[in-house]
Design a protein with these regions (language model features):
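Phosphate-binding loop of NTP-binding sites
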Residues: 13, 32-33, 65-70, 79, ...
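Glycine-rich adenosine-cofactor-binding loop
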Residues: 13-26
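Residues in the short beta-alpha loop(s) of Rossmann-like NAD(P)-binding domains
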Residues: 21, 44, 162
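Conserved Rossmann-like nucleotide-cofactor binding loop
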Residues: 23, 46, 190
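NAD(P)-binding Rossmann-fold cofactor-contacting core
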Residues: 36-51
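Glycine-rich, highly charged phosphate/nucleotide-binding loops
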Residues: 53-67
Length: 219
C-alpha cells in the first residue's frame, strides 16, 4: 500500500518513523502536515533541537524489538538502518514483524515520490526526476547534470544524498510555491534498498563495487 492510498482509506493513521536523523525528522515533519499520528523513535539517547509539531511524539533510547508494531498503519525507515543487522536496536525485527502483519514499509524516497504524485494530480505542470546511483561518482555526476540543465535555462533542484534531504527540499519548494522543472537526485543504495514506490523519468547507474558491507552484510 502506498502512503497516498493509506491517507485515502484510513482516518488519522498512526505511523512509526524509525530514526531521528536528518531523513527521519524530515519524514516525520512531512507526515505531520497530514492528519497523521506519528511516533518518531531513535535508539540513541538524543535530544532534538527543534520543536516538533504537536502530532509527533519523540521517543529516544528506544529498543526497537519492544515496539508494539500492531498499533501502526505504516512504518517509515531511515536509510542508516540496515534490514540485515539482527540486534534489538536495529531494523531486522521491525522488518520481519511488518512483513508478518502486512504493515507497509516506506522510505523517504517513497514519501517524496508520493508527494510529487499528489501534486501532479492537482496541476498540469509536472517536474521530471533524474535519479543517479552507484558506488562512486554520484555527487560529481548530479552536479554536472544540474549545471548543464541550469545553463539551458531550466529551474533545477538538487537533493538526496547530497546537500538537502529530499523532503526538506520538497517542503522548501512548496513554501515558495514554485516546483522545479527537474529534480536531480543523488540516491544511495541505503535509500533505494527498501523503496517500493519510486519511479524516475531518467535513471543513471554509474558503477557497482564492494562497499558498505557492514550495512549490506554481504557482496
Amino acid at each position: 500500500m502506498t502512503l497516498n492510498s493509506l491517507l485515502l482509506e484510513q482516518k488519522c493513521p498512526k505511523i512509526l518513523v524509525l530514526g531521528a536523523g536528518i531523513s527521519g525528522k524530515a519524514c516525520a515533519i512531512w507526515l505531520s502536515t497530514f492528519d497523521c499520528d506519528i511516533d518518531l523513535v531513535d535508539s540513541r539517547k538524543i535530544e532534538l533541537k527543534k520543536n516538533l509539531p504537536s502530532n509527533i511524539t519523540f521517543f529516544p533510547s528506544c529498543i526497537f524489538a519492544k515496539i508494539n508494531l500492531k498499533k501502526y498503519h505504516g512504518v517509515v525507515v531511515s536509510p542508516g538502518l540496515s534490514p540485515h543487522e539482527k540486534s534489538v536496536n536495529n531494523f531486522f525485527i521491525i522488518n520481519k514483524l511488518a512483513s508478518d502483519h502486512g504493515i507497509p514499509i516506506w522510505t523517504e524516497v517513497d514519501l517524496f515520490f508520493s508527494a510529487l504524485e499528489m501534486k501532479a494530480n492537482k496541476t498540469t505542470v509536472e517536474s521530471k526526476i533524474i535519479a543517479v546511483t552507484g558506488t562512486n561518482g554520484k555527487t560529481t555526476v548530479v552536479s554536472m547534470v544540474k549545471d548543464l540543465l541550469k545553463n539551458l535555462g531550466y529551474d533545477v533542484e538538487l537533493a538526496g544524498n547530497v546537500g538537502t534531504s529530499l523532503l526538506e527540499a520538497l517542503m522548501e519548494r512548496m513554501q515558495n510555491g514554485k516546483f522545479p522543472a527537474f529534480w536531480v537526485l543523488e540516491l544511495s543504495s541505503f535509500q533505494l534498498f527498501l523503496s517500493s514506490d519510486f519511479k524516475s523519468d531518467v535513471s543513471v547507474i554509474l558503477n557497482f563495487s564492494s562497499d558498505h558491507l557492514d550495512w549490506h552484510s554481504s557482496e
